[in-house]
């Protein structure tokens, strides 16, 4: 099933998930078993038009962004700043020891665990997301606020295995951004900090892609931290959408970033729709509401109660109201940075200092002088009339318009295919299947409530048959004990549904799917267990009563005597408690829902790094070379001459012979745009150099000395600040030649090399509709080869894809810092910023 999106339109974030993820949660993660018919022809045209308009407005406000929407992919240790010099993000690859992430993953996977039953009931792959640590629970129906999450409460012993990862992450945060770490550390209440860190809460996500959002509820004067704990995948980079940059992350990588900037995940880079992949990530943050007065008063109330009960295990004697700062939950202001290959390289931490100052100077020069950019790289940063952007209809949508949320009237749709699907899945509510997900106590409540209702239905049916032996339809008495037993059974079923979805807010389409299966299960039980005739109860009757339950149940409750109202409330609480005590990942059972104990920090224990022979968090953070002041300071101005070497492919004696180009829509897209036509008509850009000389030619541009040389030529033993290898690898063959080429020219760069190449992959390769992708693949190599041959006068051309080029860079002993994509380039040009690997 193709990727879909769960659309959640609400004013407030669902606090069972990371606050601020309030508009979309993508599928690959959320798939509805009934999505293909829930919004079918039963919706009239006017309603569909209104729903479509609302859907499109929501998509505009909170879209998904793909990799092609961003100009830069950061891979190495990176400090990215906005135009005012404020740090927006710090990427640190391989930041965490693998043993720490492995230990934490073993525990935190349980926080997002879903059983196979959930997928069986609703189809697809479960959206796995959960919270750990402490949470305020405001805006949720949970009565007791400002406390441990249920996961932490139920996994006290296992929780300790997360502490090394917490310590390493906190130490990295402190080393990189010490001022913000101190502010956050000073604000977080001691009762809710996780293991002495400035974090109160973790959000754990598995197989999760987010749309553009800001994190509502995070501490304004701090940074959030994202770490990938485990996984096998490509793509899903964290993108800062207003800045056009992505941070590529793999297991053990850490990203410190301003969570109040709009950010999202790019697409999964897997061409097969059913590709196997997994990714477990963790967000560390301080939930600012935990430091506000209502929560502080709750801590004090619990402490006072514990003292009155003469508790002997108190971890605190008093609660301090700290300065929590001003937390507006507003998006951060955006100060865009014009992006060039030089500004991209200047963000590399390895190039800080003198190199970054030079790169910043070069960035300013090419911004002021577009012809200098063309002189250096062969084309401008952006070509307005070049390779056209993909139209939306050419791309596989993340979402389906059929998922538009409609007004919900309770119950379920009675279309034929929906009823058939419900009947096919009714057995998932059988006792033996429920036991796979829920504890014995809750399954017993379900069984007892179900049996009680069926007994009352049987008794009523037998009475109706005695009165009228020819009766074929059951008559439902709304004032009978059977009706109240049905509502009680619905209360149990509702908790079953909440458990299956992990206590997150349930989409109305999912809810309809569930109630359809519930009704089919009961209708089948009426036939096979108490001997009613086919259709005597019927799906329609049960649907009517389910709508009555969803919209009329509270009215009946208010009409009941006070003592009956109280009994019903207690009953619902009893059901919820039983469901929450279901064993997940062998957790210890606990009465989390009613827990009022002052149990803050009771789970905390010290980690003995020396005894375990683990690197200390402080020493681990020192590996990255952050100065005492952190990464805040911007680089100074460059002085003196900057030397740049441009290496060009040597032209052959003649242009590639004109060949017959394919004719298709994709071929026309590549060959007939105005920029491509200019390349075909212009003189090759490397003809100006003398082909008879193997020596370099020097051009002076202010304090920039530019040498140009053909591949194979000599520079007389000189070293250069920067080397630009302009489309050299496309002129090499086999595996050995490109590696030798890379080794030779990158060795002449003091700081870094720009490897500029044609990328045969379409920028939307992984999300192109199959028919478009196939047509593109059939013509791309011959078309781009013709354009390259016209540009560089080459007979033989060997164009490659980004994955292939990255492999060459790695095998040649170089490290990739970033990739820059030239927007609209007729050659689909990319520039890789690489440097020699330190020995």
Swiss-Prot record:
Protein name: Thymine dioxygenase JBP1
This protein's encoding gene: JBP1
Keywords: Dioxygenase, DNA-binding, Iron, Metal-binding, Nucleus, Oxidoreductase
Cellular localisation: Nucleus
Comment block on domains: The DNA-binding JBP1 domain (DB-JBP1) is necessary and sufficient for binding to J-DNA.
Region (Thymine dioxygenase) location: 86-288
Site annotation Involved in J base recognition, conferring specificity towards J-DNA: residues: 548
Reactions listed under catalytic activity: thymine + 2-oxoglutarate + O2 = 5-hydroxymethyluracil + succinate + CO2
């Amino acid at each position: 099933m193709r990727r879909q999106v769960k659309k959640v339109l609400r004013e407030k974030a669902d606090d069972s998930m990371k606050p601020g993820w309030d508009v979309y949660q993508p599928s690959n993660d959320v798939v509805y078993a009934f999505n293909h018919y829930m919004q079918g022809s039963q919706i009239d045209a006017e309603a569909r038009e209104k729903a479509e308009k609302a859907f499109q407005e929501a998509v505009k406000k909170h879209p998904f962004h793909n990799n092609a929407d961003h100009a830069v992919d950061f891979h190495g240790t990176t400090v990215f700043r906005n135009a005012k010099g404020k740090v927006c993000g710090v990427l640190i690859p391989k930041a965490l020891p693998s043993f720490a992430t492995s230990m934490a993953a073993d525990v935190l996977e349980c926080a997002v665990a879903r059983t196979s039953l959930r997928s069986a009931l609703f189809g697809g792959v479960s959206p796995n997301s959960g919270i750990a640590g402490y949470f305020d629970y405001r805006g949720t129906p949970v009565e007791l606020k400002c406390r441990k999450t249920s996961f932490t409460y139920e996994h006290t012993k296992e929780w300790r295995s997360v502490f090394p990862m917490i310590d390493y992450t906190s130490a990295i945060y402190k080393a990189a951004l010490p001022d913000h770490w101190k502010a956050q550390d000073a604000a977080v209440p001691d009762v809710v900090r996780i293991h002495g860190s400035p974090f109160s809460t973790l959000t754990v996500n598995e197989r999760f892609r987010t749309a553009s959002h800001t994190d509502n509820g995070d501490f304004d004067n701090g940074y959030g931290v994202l770490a990938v704990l485990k996984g096998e995948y490509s793509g899903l980079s964290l993108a800062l959408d207003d800045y056009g940059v992505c941070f590529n992350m793999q297991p053990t990588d850490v990203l410190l970033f301003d969570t109040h900037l709009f950010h999202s995940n790019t697409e999964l880079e897997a061409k097969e729709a059913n590709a196997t992949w997994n990714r477990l990530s963790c967000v560390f943050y301080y939930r600012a509401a935990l430091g506000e007065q209502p929560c502080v008063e709750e801590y004090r109330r619990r402490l006072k109660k514990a003292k009155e009960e003469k508790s002997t295990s108190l971890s605190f004697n008093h609660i301090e109201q700290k300065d929590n700062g001003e937390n507006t939950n507003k998006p951060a202001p955006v100060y865009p940075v014009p992006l060039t290959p030089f500004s991209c390289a200047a963000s590399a931490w390895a190039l800080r200092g003198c190199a970054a100052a030079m790169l910043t100077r070069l960035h300013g020069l090419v911004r002021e002088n577009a012809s200098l950019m063309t002189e250096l790289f062969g084309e401008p940063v952006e070509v307005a009339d070049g390779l056209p952007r993909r139209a939306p209809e050419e791309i596989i949508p993340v979402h389906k318009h059929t998922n538009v949320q409609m007004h919900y009237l309770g119950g379920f749709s009675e279309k034929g295919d929906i009823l058939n699907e419900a009947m096919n899945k009714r057995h998932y509510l059988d006792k033996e299947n429920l036991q796979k997900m829920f504890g014995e106590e809750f399954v017993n409540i379900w069984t007892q409530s179900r049996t009680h209702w069926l007994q009352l239905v049987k008794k009523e049916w037998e009475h109706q048959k005695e009165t009228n032996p020819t009766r074929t339809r059951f008559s439902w008495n709304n004032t009978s004990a059977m009706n109240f037993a049905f509502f009680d059974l619905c209360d149990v079923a509702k908790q079953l549904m909440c458990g299956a979805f992990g206590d997150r807010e349930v989409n109305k389409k999912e809810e309809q799917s569930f109630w359809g299966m519930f009704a089919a299960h009961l209708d089948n039980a009426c036939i096979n267990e108490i001997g009613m005739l086919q259709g005597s109860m019927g799906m329609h009757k049960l649907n009517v009563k389910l709508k009555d339950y969803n919209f009329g149940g509270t009215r009946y409750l208010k009409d009941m005597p006070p003592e009956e109202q109280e009994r019903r409330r207690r009953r619902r609480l009893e059901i919820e408690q039983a469901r929450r005590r279901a064993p997940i990942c062998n957790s210890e059972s606990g009465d989390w829902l009613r827990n009022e104990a002052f149990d803050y920090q009771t789970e905390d224990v010290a980690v003995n790094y020396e005894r375990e022979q683990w690197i200390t968090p402080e020493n681990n953070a020192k590996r990255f070379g952050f100065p005492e002041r952190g990464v805040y300071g911007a680089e100074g101005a460059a002085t003196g001459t900057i030397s740049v070497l441009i290496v060009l492919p040597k032209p052959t004696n003649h242009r590639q012979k004109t060949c017959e180009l394919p004719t298709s829509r994709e071929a026309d897209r590549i060959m007939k745009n105005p920029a491509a036509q200019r390349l075909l008509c212009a003189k090759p850009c490397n003809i100006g150099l003398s082909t008879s000389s193997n020596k370099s030619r020097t051009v002076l541009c202010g304090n920039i000395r530019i040498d140009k040389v053909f591949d194979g030529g000599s520079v007389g033993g000189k070293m250069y600040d920067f080397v630009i290898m302009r489309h050299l690898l496309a002129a090499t063959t086999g595996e050995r030649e490109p590696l030798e080429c890379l080794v030779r020219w990158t060795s002449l760069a003091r700081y870094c090399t720009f490897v500029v190449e044609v990328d045969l992959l379409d920028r939307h390769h992984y999300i192109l509709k199959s028919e478009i992708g196939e047509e593109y693949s059939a013509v791309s190599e011959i078309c781009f080869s013709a354009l390259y041959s016209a540009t560089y006068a080459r007979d033989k051309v060997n164009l490659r894809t980004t994955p292939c080029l990255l492999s060459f860079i790695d095998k040649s002993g170089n490290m990739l810092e970033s990739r820059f994509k030239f927007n609209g380039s007729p050659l689909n040009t990319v520039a890789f910023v690489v440097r020699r690997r330190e020995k």
